[in-house]
Each structure stands twice: as structure tokens, then as C-alpha cells.
């Protein structure tokens, strides 16, 4: 896994000439089953060259999703609906105040390398956080974006963004969830992403003392996306 900005060649994921990426934004929380259905249909259309690549910005109502590596034991308390999903990763929470970015890109046009694609998603979020004065970091052994929390003790880090993707015919779907101002107590019902080490928790921009609107996040995401993915 690429673990530093210096070793990540962003040019690798610039698309070959074609239609620009379509940006979609949903203003109301989207039920999870409907979102998955929409992603799968769009990914199939992209793979068949019938639709442009797309980034979909949305929120979900409170729920849990369990990826292909998930364990039932990591659901401590079933307070909200649980959905099994084909994305990579383990169990996580989605809810209001969290910016979900579902990323449907044709990696054949870019670079058919899953590990580097995930590293580019991390870089995208790191650059977005930097726009708000937050230093996000990637870790080789823990997918996602992390924030050092020395105020909580030596070696303590909190995850601020989770990543889980699936590919079909080299078109990605699912994507990234960035904690802006969700109810962090809802993460107590699970072992987030299977990480049980007490040094590693969950945070949000609000938890870090920043009051940021989702519209501001969306603008930063769109700007930094072009820096990383080239369109």
C-alpha cells in the first residue's frame, strides 16, 4: 500500500480523453437499498460505455453496512438496520452528518490497480481535509484516513473517513464516507471496520472543533478530486 504523498503518482489515475465525470448530489437521506441499486445500474452503464463516470454525494438514514470481510460479532448492538453489501471492508455506520461519496469510475480508462485506486481515494480525502486545516493521514495496515489525537494519549489516532469499494468489469462503485458532524455515539454499537484496539477511535470535523457545512465539503471534494483524478 502506498503510504506517503511523495510516492503516489497521481498521473496514473488521470482518465484518457472522454466524457467528464458527472457529479450528482442528493439533498435528502437516501435509503441504502435504493442507493446500491442505482450504483449497480450506473456502473453497468459505464462498463458498457452508455454513461459517463459519476461521483454521487449523499447521506443515508442511520444504518450499518457489513462488507465482505465483516463479522457478525462486530455488531455489538443492533440499534439500526444492518445491510450486507458486496463492498470490501468490514462493518461501519452511516447516518446524517456524514458525507458519502460513491465513486463510479472506469479503471480501464485510468489504471486497473485496486490498491493504488484506494490510495488515491485516501489522497482525495487527505487533500479535502487539508482545505479545512485538518491533517489526515493514511496507514499501511489500516485502510481509511486517520487523524492523530495526542490529546487522548500516546499513539492515539481516530478515523475520520472510511473507504470500501467494489469493482465489476473494472468499474468501481461504493466509495468513501467522511465524518462531518454525525452522531458519533452510534459508532459505539459496532467495532468500526473491525478495529478493536482502544488506541484507535472515530472522530469527525465537528468533534475536532470545526463547524463545516456539507455544501462546503462538497465544493472541496469536487476541487480536490480534479487534482487527484484529473477530471
Curated annotation (Swiss-Prot):
Record flagged with keyword Transferase: yes
Domain BPL/LPL catalytic residue range list: 49-231
Cross-referenced PROSITE patterns: BPL_LPL_CATALYTIC, LIPB
GO molecular function: lipoyl(octanoyl) transferase activity
Top-level enzyme category: transferase
SUPFAM superfamilies: Class II aaRS and biotin synthetases
Metabolic or biological pathway: Protein modification; protein lipoylation via endogenous pathway; protein N(6)-(lipoyl)lysine from octanoyl-[acyl-carrier-protein]: step 1/2
A Pfam family this chain is assigned to: LplA-B_cat
Catalytic site positions: 193 (acyl-thioester intermediate)
Amino-acid positions noted as binding substrate in the UniProt annotation, renumbered to this chain: 87-94, 162-164, 175-177
Catalytic activity: octanoyl-[ACP] + L-lysyl-[protein] = N(6)-octanoyl-L-lysyl-[protein] + holo-[ACP] + H(+)
An example Gene Ontology biological process: protein modification process
Site label Lowers pKa of active site Cys, positions: 159
InterPro entries documented for this protein: aa-tRNA-synth_II/BPL/LPL, BPL_LPL_catalytic, Octanoyltransferase, Octanoyltransferase_CS
Function in brief: Catalyzes the transfer of endogenously produced octanoic acid from octanoyl-acyl-carrier-protein onto the lipoyl domains of lipoate-dependent enzymes. Lipoyl-ACP can also act as a substrate although octanoyl-ACP is likely to be the physiological substrate.
Family affiliation: Belongs to the LipB family.
Protein name, as recorded: Octanoyltransferase
Protein source organism: Nitrobacter winogradskyi (strain ATCC 25391 / DSM 10237 / CIP 104748 / NCIMB 11846 / Nb-255)
